[in-house]
Amino acid sequence: MKSMFKLSALFVAMGITALGVAPVAQAATAPAEKATAVLVHGAFADGSSWDEIIPSLHAHDLKVVSVQNPLSSLADDVAATRRALDAQTGPVVLVGHSWGGMVITEVGNHSRVQSLVYVASFAPSVGQSINDLAKDYAKPSGLDHVVVDKEGFVTMSFEGISQHFAQDLPVAKHRLMTATQGAIRGAAFDEKVSVAAWATKPSWFIVSDQDRMIQPALQLDNAKKISATTIRVRAGHVPQLSTPKEVIKAILDAAKLNNE
């Protein structure tokens, strides 16, 4: 009996030891979660404006969310983007095109956001609106081709889309973009940001040298102000469609920062 008791005690001891080891194995560090690219479109557009780059981002094992902004106010677009950020579980590269730069500047202090990518965009300081940013630069030619409805919402004519917004894309794309564009409330261009997320988050900036909607000089000055990694492209206002490789690379570079 004593031998059996000793053997049982040995087995119990071994069991206790095994139980002690198991939690250590389970506590092994899990692989870092891949970043999600949250894409924020601009005025006169919708979430499909990112269609050219989304498959490549997926191919590089990034998750992607393309926000559908209501374009009814800065606050409404920030709320839509914040909901998308709240739904993520890992680090986020927050990307904004054109007016979307206002949105990511305001909401980019979200805890999930690790880096910002501005694409032919605005990067305001606290207390600045788009009209504040643009007042010291020549009026872009594209702004002569906007249509304002009786409720103050603004769209672009086909001529504006084809000759000034996306002059470096084929005519079939012009027709599609004109048909699917989002109308933005004109008063939004006077709305000011209360946060400048770029002050605390690493930033990238795609500057479009042939932009006819936002002066390239304004883009360059904004990129310099925020100390962004700056990439210049020979493109119109939608480089994510006309020169997608450069935009994809900037997003991937920002994502690598998250996964180091």
Task: Give residue spans per PLM region.
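Bacterial N-terminal signal peptides that target proteins for export
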Residues: M1-F11
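Bacterial N-terminal signal peptides
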Residues: A9-G20
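Active-site catalytic motif of lipid deacylating hydrolases and related acyltransferases
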Residues: A30-T89
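Gly/Ala-rich beta-loop-alpha elbow adjacent to hydrolase catalytic centers
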Residues: V95-G100, I104
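Flexible "cap/lid" loop of the alpha/beta hydrolase fold
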Residues: N109-V113, V117-F158, R185-A188
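Active-site nucleophile elbow and catalytic-triad environment of alpha/beta-hydrolase enzymes
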Residues: L176-W198
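Short beta-strand/loop motif that positions the catalytic acidic residue
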Residues: F205-V207
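Conserved loop-alpha-helix segment in the C-terminal half of the alpha/beta-hydrolase fold
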Residues: D209-A235, L241, A254
